[in-house]
Amino acid sequence: ILPKSGMKAFIPDFGRIVALMQFNMYHWFTVDEHTIQCLKVLSEIEKLPKNYGTAVEEIFSRKSLNRKILYLSILFHDIGKGLENDHSIEGEKIATKLCKRFTLQDSERKKVSWLVRNHLMMSDFAQKRDLSDQKTIIDFQGQVQDRETLDLLFILTVCDIKGVSSDAWLSLIHI
């Protein structure tokens, strides 16, 4: 992983989130440090997916998992913070622009942008909706649409939550 100064030089939009504090009870880290923590979590998962549960291990056993999309969506998931509007919407715009710098297929660029915009969806559904209500599941399925997107969103959500703090991860796995 690039040091923060290298990240800012490589991706100027990253400069806005360097040392940007998050004033809530969940985040232990500044936005840039949280992003780096999320990337570290993904690296840990790749080495030992079984340590993160059966679902994670199953997803990583599939050869079809597009790690390029996963790494870029984690790198960009909070890049819209520090702007006036919703960070997910702003992040999607920035990710769409930045993805043009990488050798990605159009479908990959769209997937990264979608994941950045919707990176909070799974945790929001899990924490704010009744998971025993069939309508909740149908609503979620309608937004996610396919297995690849579900897998990517699930891993992004795990990395995002574990990258917030150990306590956030522990409280979530006990839901």
Predicted features along the sequence, with ranges:
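Histidine/acidic-rich helix-loop-helix segments that form or flank divalent-metal centers
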Residues: 20-21, 25-28, 50-65, 104-171
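Conserved small/polar residues in nucleotide/adenosyl-binding loops
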Residues: 173-175
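Acidic/His-rich, divalent-metal-binding segments that scaffold phosphate/diphosphate chemistry
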Residues: 1-88, 97, 103
